[in-house]
């Protein structure tokens, strides 16, 4: 019995170790306002060829939910705005909704969240707004009645217009007209451990302020940044600023601990003549840099160290959506399953390895002394979003440790430099980088480059200690550098040793 308990706690402990391939924070919206979509079975094959771990549906299409069974892909299903009145007024309607849309598929299909309505608070329909919370409560009770209350969460989705103030991010607050309705909803989310779902779109922020510096800020590209006048924090991208504004708004109402989920964000690859910024290049830059930013695990300035679960809009272009041309051009993939543009979502067997490190240049590109973490994070996001394989600095990769911005930026900057024509501007990164003759490789983390007398980065060369590895991460051993065993791993080894001595 004691051994079983020990193993149980060991499994819990091990579950907190990251997988080298799992990216549970990256999802995609699977819209269906189209008449040319591939069958669900083909879409599932497409998803399985990527690192996408979650899918958000706007409804509860049984064919899609069933097709996702056994894949491990997390699923968000939705009750439509038109369902809200009956769900609010009749608990039996909520029970029937769960019986029809959840029970036939769960747990084979990994349903995680039910969104009740989409942007209802902004609908200007007071009756619908008043019915939203009762509808959510009845859906929650229906889940609890079948013992799924703690396994499937219930929320609703909001647009950024729910905020009355968002600049600076630390002053974020909900619009006065929404606060009364939100108070009960936020209490419900807090009580049930459910997330606050929001739709931030830097794409629309740029359209309202189409300056070059705004575009760079929205696309995660190197820029001067924007300083929060209250906190002194410099923001280098619009996404973080918008998400932190939502966090501040939640905090202002006493719900700081309610988790934020980005239910939608994306960038149009084409648009009408008056839709500034809608292009393939900008869409690739935004989504690619966003994914790189999430993979960096840096979080946001007000929520550091934790990537926000984010659903990119959208999986496919939807040719029947009304409105301007951009509404039909947010897809990552065409309906023939080919990519509209590549943002690095395809699975790669080499994601946990470093390149061979052949001598390709006379030097390595590394951060300049004095560059700030904010500047380096922007450079890291930009490099990884422009065709660089940053798998080595993701969890499980050979260069993931030390897990800090400086080390990860050094690797990404150098990878970009080695793939470029190696002009001085290719190792500039807004004046935050420089070329060095000192090989920054360490242990099994190989930085391609070198040449001349500097010593290549190949496996047979003796790499000098990477000065971007912080002193608390390394110690010298026989002239080489070795990573210290992390406290978590030390605990694990001690734990296993105790089990061995007690039970063997």
From Swiss-Prot:
One of its GO terms (biological process) is cell wall organization. It catalyses: Hydrolysis of (1->3)-beta-D-glucosidic linkages in (1->3)-beta-D-glucans. Its main location: secreted. Keywords: Cell wall, Cell wall biogenesis/degradation, Disulfide bond, Glycosidase, Hydrolase, Secreted, Signal. The lineage of its organism: Eukaryota, Viridiplantae, Streptophyta, Embryophyta, Tracheophyta. InterPro entries: Glyco_hydro_17, Glyco_hydro_17_plant, Glycoside_hydrolase_SF, X8. Coiled coil: none annotated. It is an enzyme of class 3 (hydrolase). Disulfide bonds join 365-427. Pfam families: Glyco_hydro_17, X8. Residues 1-22 form the signal peptide. Belongs to the glycosyl hydrolase 17 family. One of its GO terms (molecular function) is glucan endo-1,3-beta-D-glucosidase activity. GO terms for cellular component: extracellular region. SMART domains: X8. This is Glucan endo-1,3-beta-glucosidase 7. It comes from the Eukaryota. The active site is at residues 119, 264. Its EC number is 3.2.1.39. Contains two additional disulfide bonds. It is found in: Secreted; Secreted, Cell wall. Transmembrane segments: none annotated.
């Amino acid at each position: 019995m004691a051994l079983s308990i020990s193993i149980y706690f060991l499994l819990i402990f091990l579950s907190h170790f990251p997988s080298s391939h799992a990216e549970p924070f990256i999802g995609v919206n699977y819209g269906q306002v189209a008449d040319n979509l591939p069958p669900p079975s083909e879409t599932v094959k497409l998803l399985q060829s990527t690192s996408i771990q979650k899918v958000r549906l706007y409804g509860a299409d049984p064919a899609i939910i069933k097709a996702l069974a056994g894949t491990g892909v997390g699923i968000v299903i939705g009750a439509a705005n038109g369902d809200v009145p009956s769900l609010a007024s009749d608990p039996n309607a909520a029970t029937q909704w769960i019986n029809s849309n959840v029970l036939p598929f769960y747990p084979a299909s990994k349903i995680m969240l039910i969104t009740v309505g989409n942007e209802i608070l902004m609908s200007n329909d007071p009756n619908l707004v008043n019915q939203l919370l009762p509808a959510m409560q009845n859906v929650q009770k229906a889940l609890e009645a079948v013992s799924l209350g703690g396994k499937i969460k219930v929320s609703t989705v909001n647009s950024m217009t729910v905020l009355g103030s968002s600049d600076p991010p630390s002053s974020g607050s909900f619009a006065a007209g929404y606060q009364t309705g939100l108070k009960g909803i936020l209490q419900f989310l807090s009580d049930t451990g459910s997330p606050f779902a929001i739709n931030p779109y830097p794409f629309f922020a740029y359209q309202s302020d189409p300056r070059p510096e705004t575009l760079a800020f929205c696309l995660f590209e190197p820029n001067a940044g924007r300083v929060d006048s209250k906190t002194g924090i410099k923001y280098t991208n619009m996404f973080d600023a918008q998400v932190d504004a939502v966090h501040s708004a939640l905090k202002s109402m006493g719900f700081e601990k309610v988790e934020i989920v980005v239910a939608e964000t994306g960038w149009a690859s084409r648009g009408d003549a008056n839709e500034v910024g809608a292009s393939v290049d900008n869409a690739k830059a935004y989504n690619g840099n966003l994914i790189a930013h999430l993979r960096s695990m840096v979080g946001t300035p007000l929520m550091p160290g934790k990537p926000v679960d984010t659903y990119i809009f959208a999986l496919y272009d939807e040719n029947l959506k009304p409105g301007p041309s951009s509404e039909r051009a947010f897809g990552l993939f065409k309906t023939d399953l080919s990519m509209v543009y590549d943002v690095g979502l395809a699975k790669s067997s080499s994601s946990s390895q470093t390149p061979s490190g052949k001598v390709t240049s006379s030097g390595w590109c590394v951060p300049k002394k004095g560059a700030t973490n904010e500047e380096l994070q922007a450079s890291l996001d930009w490099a990884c979003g422009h065709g660089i394989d940053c798998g080595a600095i993701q969890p499980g990769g050979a260069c993931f440790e030390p897990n800090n911005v400086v080390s990860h930026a050094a690797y990404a900057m150098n990878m970009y430099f080695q793939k470029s024509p190696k002009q001085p501007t290719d190792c500039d990164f807004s004046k935050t980088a420089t070329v060095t003759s000192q090989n920054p490789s360490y242990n099994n983390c190989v930085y391609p480059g070198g040449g001349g007398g500097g010593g290549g980065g190949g496996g047979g060369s003796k790499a000098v200690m990477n000065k971007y590895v912080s002193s608390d991460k390394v110690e010298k051993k026989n002239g080489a550098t070795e990573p210290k065993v992390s406290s978590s791993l030390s605990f694990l080894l001690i734990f296993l040793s105790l089990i061995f001595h007690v039970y063997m």
